[in-house]
Design a protein with these regions (language model features):
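Short, compositionally biased P/S/T/A/G/V-rich stretches that sit at domain boundaries
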Residues: 241-252
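Flexible coil/loop interruptions and hinge/linker segments embedded within long fibrous stalks
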Residues: 219-223, 227
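Beta-rich nucleic-acid/ligand-interaction surfaces
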Residues: 131-145
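Substrate-binding cleft of extracellular glycoside hydrolase catalytic domains
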Residues: 1-117, 121-126
């Protein structure tokens, strides 16, 4: 099977989900902290309500900044709390790609990712790993992560990752992808596994009652806004760098 979907964050701004035509959506739930915990994407609650109202199957991803396995486990617990009132049809992905990890060892990066994935699984969620091909090849020990479903970004004409593990979702472009109801570019993905059927078989139905506010104990809005601005700048820089690398590879 093959279905087409998108992934979005606050970078896309306000989305008119009634106009979006897609098979699935992966929402950014937020990003983790160096020492543990997480910040919620400022558009997550609205996006979650929007996709549910539109009847679009969805999952989430958490952008990683954790600097230790202990921090990753705390982030997983916070994310599990956030998702308690939702019924997901796609996995919870750990997005490990930030440049800070290129300065850390492969062993440390792998231990951090594994800690998050194991913790999410212990919390009862279907956990998966998101990264891009060269990061997986250079900064992770993929043999230790092969038990988890992979979502790989590779903007070449075909999936280039051939390492350990199964790639069930391919992010094949980050620019030029347009979807009605969303302003600007949006990441485009292909999925090769029937996650909704798996989720229906594994999880009893729960009443959908999205929370109306942010849980107590989260970071002040001013700090959230500053971190959001920093993240958006990093995301733009990463996308530009990745596109230039892919262009060089294609021209070689």
């Amino acid at each position: 099977m093959e279905v087409s979907g998108i992934d979005v964050s606050s970078h896309q701004g306000i989305i008119d989900w009634s106009k979006v035509q897609t098979d699935f959506v992966i929402l950014r739930a937020g990003w983790s902290w160096y020492q543990g915990g997480m910040n919620i994407d400022k558009c997550f609650l609205e996006n979650a309500q929007g996709v549910q109202k539109a009847g679009i199957p969805w999952g989430v991803y958490l952008y990683a900044y954790d600097k230790s396995p202990a921090a990753a486990r705390i982030a997983a617990a916070r994310l599990s709390d956030l998702l308690a009132d939702y019924e997901l049809a796609y996995p919870v992905y750990y997005d490990i790609e930030d440049t800070k990890y290129t300065k850390m060892s492969r062993e440390d990066n792998t231990a951090i990712a594994l800690a998050f994935l194991e913790a999410m699984q212990d919390h009862g969620h279907y956990a998966g790993l998101y990264t891009y091909t060269s990061f997986a090849n250079s900064f992770l020990t993929m043999e230790k992560l092969a038990a988890y479903d992979l979502w790989i970004a590779d903007y070449r004409s075909k999936m280039g990752y051939t390492g350990p593990g199964d790639v069930w979702m391919w992010q094949h472009t980050g620019t030029g992808g347009r979807t009605q109801g969303i302003n600007g570019d949006v990441d485009q993905n292909l999925c090769y596994k029937d996650y909704p059927a798996i989720m229906r078989a594994a999880v009893p139905p729960v009443e959908q009652n999205p929370p109306t506010g942010i849980p107590d104990g989260w970071v002040p809005q001013a700090v959230v806004d500053k971190l959001q601005a920093d993240y958006d700048a990093l995301e733009a820089k990463h996308s530009d760098t990745l596109n230039r690398i892919m262009n060089i590879i294609q021209e070689a």
